[in-house]
Amino acid sequence: MKRIKQLIVVMFSIFIFFDASGQQSEWEQLFNGKDLTGWNVICQPKDAEKKIWVVEDGAISCNTLNMKGHNHVWLVSEREFSNFELHLKFQAFTESPGNSGIQFRARFDTNLDGGWMNGPQVDIHPPKSMNWRTGLIYDETFEEKRWVFPSLPNWDMERKYEPKEHIFKYAEDGDGWNELILICNGMQVKTIVNGIVRTDWDATGVLDNEHHKKRNVGEKGHFALQLHNGDNLKIKYKDIQIKEFK
């Protein structure tokens, strides 16, 4: 019964966004399951030969558990998007202490700290003690670098923000694929993780503020799968598809 209620909430939430969006395009696959066509790795020159983002068994895979000394490495969509509904699946591993995420409406700036990916990010946090952060929004824009949903002054987040209900699966659990939906329509941003709404946010005054306009992000840009500087991370992504709102 609980699962049925979750599905009803998801369908109703998506319907509201669709109703306000006007016409929609058809579903498109952003990852073909075979190679990284349509995606580019962006990193420091010293990391270029490390093959951090690869395709294995029909999924995009990142495994740096035994790798030292890497900087930030992003896998970035060639295309830009503004208003859309994005669906994907990700698989996390209990042995992975690192953090990942999906930046959206993002853009790389070569002039910042040797290169920086500006833009908001849907957080994906595998460590069990904080996996409830998954689906919340952290802003990687250079002048922000803070949680924007919930709105906090920096990267720190106390357990009082932990929801009463959340679902996070691991590969070790068997069917360990998590389902994530990201919907952006104007300044309305919604995330749904495994059938549970995690973010329902009016980003007016944030994603369209002077910092985001300066970096040309927040309203339109690329997707970027993220590996943090020095993180030991093991994660996989697959079934990445999108429907744009016209």
Label the model's feature ranges.
Residues 22-246:
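Carbohydrate-interacting regions of secretory-pathway proteins
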